[in-house]
Amino acid sequence: MTKDMLELSIVIVSYNRSLVLVDTIGYLLNLDAYSNSEIEIIIVDQTINHTEAAQQALSKWSQKNVIRWIRLDKPDLTRAMNRGLLEARSKLVLYLDDDIIPDQKLLVCHLDAHRRKPSVGVVIGQILQPGETPMSVNYKPRKSGLKAFMDFPFRSTEGCMVENAMAGNMSLKRETALRHGGFDQQFIPPVAARFETEFAKRLVKSGEKIWFEPSASIRHLANSSGGTRAKGSHLNSAQPYFGFGDYYYALKHGAPLDCMGYCLTRFFREVRTKYHLTHPWYIPVKWLGEIRAFFMALKASRQPQKLIPESDREY
């Protein structure tokens, strides 16, 4: 089947999620427009061992060509995102988290947004985190530079142009994403914090537009296991991967003074928490992780971004 024949490719990158992934796929199969359109579901699965029930469900769907089930041998979020982009057979690709409940009109609204906004390369849908409800917000960016749109409320009910992204409910023109190299694989797996913001900043700098579409809504379950939570808590860890992405983003895209302020703010903010107030012995542990993260990010920022090679970008 050619890209022209497919209307939409849904890509779900999953890590250490079993039954919640099966539930998410089940919700998608029952959405408006799914049965009436040429839509494919691609699961880029980084889970080594599924529960027996999940393994059976995924295998059955794969054998019946309900899903395309791609297995990867190790977790690497941006690598998996790029794999999904390359495998997609539609001109439009919709990335979704593996632990969501989608609104019944999710697919229709993403497709409609691209039809209404042909100059837009990326559409970000509404994301309701646990306990959140939709909220009318007349948003105006209060900050510029690295922090521009960092505080954008993705539960807003007002559509607008944005300069940030959340990959858990993001549709894009495949050609646009490929032209800019996809997602940067310098981000340390599996956390890869700020990779969406880096992607958005890179596209906006190149003249691309990103539209926030509130009608394309999901409820994010924020499952307590799997995903980026598989590496434990950032509060008491000296590991660098929790902070690497934030520093790397700043070093890649910030002007010198903006970058310095951003990095220093993060360094001190990370220990100004209720947890560290009651567990002060973890402050030096956390700072050790932040120092390691900064110097790893500094080294990585001096290298070319690890994007999809030109030779692999089949538009």
Spans of features found by a protein language model:
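Short, flexible, basic/aromatic active-site loop/helix in glycosyltransferases
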Residues: R142-E163
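Glycine-rich, basic loop-to-helix element that forms the pyrophosphate-binding segment
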Residues: L72-A88
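Acidic donor-binding loop at a coil-to-helix junction in glycosyltransferase catalytic cores
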Residues: P189-F199
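Short aromatic/hydrophobic "clamp" motif used to bind/position activated sugar donors
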Residues: V93
